[in-house]
Amino acid sequence: MRVFMTGAGGGMGFESFKAMLPDLGKLYDLVLLLRDSEKNRKLFAPYMDTKGLTIHWGDLLNREDVADCVQGADIVLHIAAFVSPQADYFPRKAMANNYGSTRNLIEAIQSLDQGDSTRFVYIGTVAETGDRMPPIHWGRVGDPIKPSMFDYYAVSKVAAERYVIESGLTYWVSLRQTGIIGPAMAKIRDPIQFHNCLDNVLEYASDRDSGRLMRNLCAYEAEGTLDPSFWGHVYNIGGGESCRVDTYTMYKIMYGEIGIKNIDYVIDPKVNATRNFHGQYYLDSDKLENYLHFRSDSMQYFYDAYLKELGPAKPFGRIICKLPGGQKLMGAIIKSTFNKLLESEHGPRYWLKNNMEDHMPTGAVARPGRPFPRKPAKWTTSPIGTRWCPWTTATTKPSPRASSTGPIWPGLPNSGAESSSPRP
């Protein structure tokens, strides 16, 4: 069997590549289309002589490069994407890459008369469903597609996913990726961290589990054990209950690891969005797990990666926080590192200073006269901060309601024609 994978030089792609290595030359051969960059050349130098591996140096927007790789492929794993936060800075590039590459791949499959044989695996995103703040933070495939304002990445992925679904391919699937925890997330230093609301929730998945997901899909298909009913659907990728967390709790644990027990020393609600991001807990992420059995990690994997990224700052911070007034001092040091981000192009303070009125309704800036209230100085004493717990700390899937007239799940509307059991 022949597998063609895009995006192997990225986070999820490289983890998938590493997970697939033991199978190469045995269960299937692997073809990669990689951008010819110094980074990719260095990253894949140790694997150039791997049995069952073929590397094409080229561009997904070049139709000839794409056709060369698609020809004879039994499975196409389209993992490559121009993602946030980079997509926020270059929205046209996001659309050209994310939609354009998907279209090129599908057109190549069809032009090679492989539309009835090639399995096409598209990686979508949780951002497609946009803002799902409590109390509508439990979601499922089939919920409204509504990217948040200014989320050009999400718009490009919606367009690409629709193209896949309407392509006419016999075997396709869209797997909507969530926030990916791991070393890469621990390294993020970008204003996007202030776009995430403190009472927002996400059901994350680890980079390693995401790689295992791709490997298992290919292995099961090669072995003939993947249920044919898997194809022709959209699924949510999620790590399950152990990977569900709200933003505030995540920060509380992260900073608690270095000794800061009072999160108000670090978190300033005035610089975090109150809406217009994305995220939800999934009612249906177990479906994909039941097919592909990929879950292994929990949120602790991310906290460990964060502490490793801190390096020498971790023991230093713990020592400081044990001293009188140390927690407050350490909090001030951490806050000072945020200032440059807040005042950069996509930072809330930048929007405020430059009177970017179109960004104000997103809730990312506290300002008098706007259609949302002035934000409190402390999260733990704010109206939201004191009432959010029952919603977001409950990470166990809610039980279906017995009523056939009310919502089946909290925060989700009933069509009026459904029974009391959740949709399949």
Please give the residue ranges for each predicted region.
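Conserved beta-loop-beta element that borders a ligand/cofactor-binding pocket
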Residues: 158-183, 229
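NAD(P)H-binding glycine-rich loop region in Rossmannoid oxidoreductase-like domains
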Residues: 49-97
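Conserved glycine-rich Rossmann-like NAD(P)H-binding loop of the short-chain dehydrogenase/reductase
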Residues: 24-39
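Glycine-rich NAD(P)-binding loop of the Rossmann-fold in SDR/ketoreductase-type enzymes
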Residues: 61, 93-104, 147, 151, ...
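Mid/C-terminal beta-alpha module of Rossmann-like enzyme folds, strongest
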Residues: 217-291, 297-305, 310-323, 327-386
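N-terminal Rossmann NAD(P)H-binding glycine-rich loop of SDR-like oxidoreductase domains
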Residues: 1-23
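Conserved Rossmann-fold NAD(P)-dependent oxidoreductase catalytic core, especially the SDR/UDP-sugar
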Residues: 82, 103-150, 173
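Substrate-positioning beta->alpha
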Residues: 196-223, 233
